[in-house]
UniProtKB/Swiss-Prot annotation:
Biological classification of the source: Bacteria, Bacillati, Actinomycetota, Actinomycetes, Mycobacteriales
The protein, known as: CTP synthase
Note: CTPSs have evolved a hybrid strategy for distinguishing between UTP and CTP. The overlapping regions of the product feedback inhibitory and substrate sites recognize a common feature in both compounds, the triphosphate moiety. To differentiate isosteric substrate and product pyrimidine rings, an additional pocket far from the expected kinase/ligase catalytic site, specifically recognizes the cytosine and ribose portions of the product inhibitor.
Active site (record annotation): 393, 524, 526
UniProt keyword ATP-binding present: yes
Residues at which Mg(2+) binds: 78, 152
GO cellular component: cytosol
Enzyme Commission identifier(s): 6.3.4.2
Function: Catalyzes the ATP-dependent amination of UTP to CTP with either L-glutamine or ammonia as the source of nitrogen. Regulates intracellular CTP levels through interactions with the four ribonucleotide triphosphates.
Pathway info: Pyrimidine metabolism; CTP biosynthesis via de novo pathway; CTP from UDP: step 2/2
């Protein structure tokens, strides 16, 4: 009788060594895509060793974006990679942090569930980690179990914070049997230019550190800026005691969407299914090859300005970037991102310099007052020139503030930025007021996750979605103040989508006869975009940018309101010269 009967679900762990930011998440995502293309059901999970319960309150400059799942969990940005490569929605259980694990264990101790035991890292913390790992193998809503669970272990081998997670993974292999668990280790093979050599010692030491805690990797991903020669692969296989078929060279790829092809060329997917005795078929490249043609063979190029507060770290807008690029794939267009700090747009000269040669302006989400006037100035500049504008979350709120100021509410602002403003056109949501006032925790308390919306028939957004009923993910505490709807509408801005009860403004836009494309959404549609299924709003935005570039649109006439609300019309194009380089 087998001591470890084959399980219905196999587990594959991805760890990293030598250095951080080697691409463990993209490696895991790409392998997941390959196994999915072989007909297997795959789900993924990220284990994060930090003590935060979730990244929701972390500084974007430190952590990057917060990826919100359908069920409202604030998760690591790698979960976004998982969803995009697998083309499936994941839940909050796809991200486990040390903070979550310790919170659960301490709560159990307070309830007396450990019956007087001394609570320790082993077994109590590791058992809780194992419970969360094994929960990923449970049947989903349709009663089907995944064939493979891919679990990425954050951090680097040797970090103190990662040790409980690595120990838990080791125990999973012990509990389920070696034939049911696979360890993949991502390591750096640096190239020393002065000597012209690739060095294998860092990888050997990284694997030695992993083996010292009881884990022998089944395969190694060798990260390098060039291909690793066969002779060095053989040396690494010998010194690290890894099958030569499991030594995978992964030089830097032109695009992240090329990585599945790189891994397949090295036959990693075949090695995994053979080792885990998985049923499989040949890889179906139909959809992915079409994507790669769109990535590498664009028919045109457009420039989109991303006017944000955190542009020094592109990871703060990772899903936004991928969604814009996917919108370009839809139209066989390459999207070049022009990174614009919103602080740089606060003066007329600054905004003209930053946006003078772009074909579209995207205003992403964010928090806090810094840079807000620059975002509003960018919207005014774009409106006066027929330049397409797309606002996300805070971007919608800035569009509304700009519209309100244009009809005489010169002190219009958000309660977030100016609590004492006489015209709070953006107000705190009723169920968030006690949180904003400091009477409750900030973490995990925003309006989070998927919510439905009803769109106005014939609107730009309804035409883009090809539907009047949609659902999008959210992450916010503030909303359009309904007391100002009628006054704001005097600017021409339409409230083209609301919550089903009509209370919460979800989408705004200017009619095409007033401006070709100014659209804002309170949601974060970038979180649902896929490279093979671009989000319709991003596709529509990129199409508007293409039309702007091709049409060389003339400036539009805008009504200007003086402080008493009276209207004065100026032909903007007569007073402000056209940008010199639009193509």
């Amino acid at each position: 009788m087998r001591r470890h009967p084959q399980t219905a679900t196999k587990h594959l762990f991805v760890s990293g060594g030598v250095a951080s930011s080697l691409g463990k998440g993209l490696t895991a995502s790409s392998l997941g895509q390959l196994l999915t293309a072989r007909g297997l059901r795959v789900t993924m999970q990220k284990l994060d060793p930090y003590l935060n319960v979730d990244p929701g309150t972390m500084n974007p400059f430190q952590h990057g974006e917060v990826f919100v799942t359908e069920d409202g969990a604030e998760t690591d940005l790698d979960v976004g990679h998982y969803e995009r490569f697998l083309d499936r929605d994941l839940s909050g259980s796809a991200n486990v942090t040390t903070g979550q694990v310790y919170s659960t264990v301490i709560a159990k101790e307070r309830r007396g569930e450990y019956l007087g035991d001394t609570v320790q890292v082993i077994p109590h913390i590791t058992d809780e980690i194992k419970r969360r790992i094994m929960a990923m193998a449970e049947p989903n809503a349709d009663g089907r179990r995944p064939d493979v669970v891919i679990t990425e272990i954050g951090g680097t081998v040797g970090d103190i914070e990662s040790q409980p997670f690595l120990e838990a993974a080791r125990q999973v292999r012990h509990d389920l049997g070696r034939e049911n668990v696979f360890f993949l280790h991502v390591s750096l093979v640096p190239y020393l230019a002065p000597s012209g050599e690739l060095k294998t010692k860092p990888t050997q030491h990284s694997v030695a550190a992993l083996r010292s805690i009881g884990i022998t990797p089944d395969a190694l991903i060798l990260r390098c800026d060039r291909d690793v020669p066969e002779a060095l692969k053989n040396k690494i296989a010998l010194m690290c005691d890894v099958d030569i078929d499991g030594i995978i060279s992964t030089p830097d790829a032109p695009s992240i969407y090329d990585i599945p092809k790189v891994l397949h060329r090295e036959e990693l997917d075949a090695f995994v299914v053979r080792r885990l005795n998985l049923p499989f078929r040949d890889v179906d490249w139909t959809e992915w090859d079409d994507l790669l043609r769109r990535v590498h063979e664009p028919k045109e190029t457009v420039r989109i300005a991303l006017v944000g507060k955190y542009v020094e770290l592109s990871d703060a807008y990772l899903s936004v970037i991928e969604a814009i690029r996917a919108g370009g794939f839809k139209h066989r267009a390459k999207v070049e991102i022009s990174w614009v700090g919103s602080d740089d747009c606060q003066t007329d000269g600054g905004v003209a310099s930053a946006l003078g040669d772009v074909h579209g302006v995207l205003i992403p989400g964010g928090f806090g007052i810094r840079g807000i006037e620059g975002k509003i100035s960018a919207i005014s500049y774009a409106r006066s020139r027929g330049l397409p504008v797309f606002g996300l979350c805070l971007g919608l709120q800035c569009i509304v503030i700009e519209a309100a100021r244009s009809v005489g509410l010169t002190e219009a602002n958000s309660a977030e930025f100016e609590p004492g403003t006489p015209d709070p056109v953006i107000s705190t949501m009723a169920d968030q007021e006690h949180i904003v006032s400091g009477q409750a925790d900030l973490g995990g308390t925003m309006r989070l996750g998927a919510y439905p919306a009803v769109l106005e028939s014939g609107s730009i957004v309804a035409e883009a979605y090809q539907s009047t009923k949609v659902s999008e993910r959210h992450r916010h505490r503030y909303e359009v103040n309904n007391a100002y709807r009628d006054r704001i509408a005097e600017s021409g801005l339409r409230f083209s989508g609301t919550s089903p009860d009509g209370h919460l403004v979800e989408f705004v836009e200017y009619p095409p006869e007033q401006h070709p494309f100014v659209v804002g959404t309170q949601a974060h549609p970038e979180l649902k975009s896929r490279p093979t299924r671009p989000h319709p709003l991003f596709a529509a935005f990129v199409k508007a940018a293409i039309d702007y570039k091709e049409g060389e649109l003339l400036p539009v006439e805008m009504p200007e309101r003086v402080s008493n609300g009276a209207e004065r019309r100026d032909q903007v194009g007569q007073s402000i010269p056209e940008p010199a380089n639009r193509g």
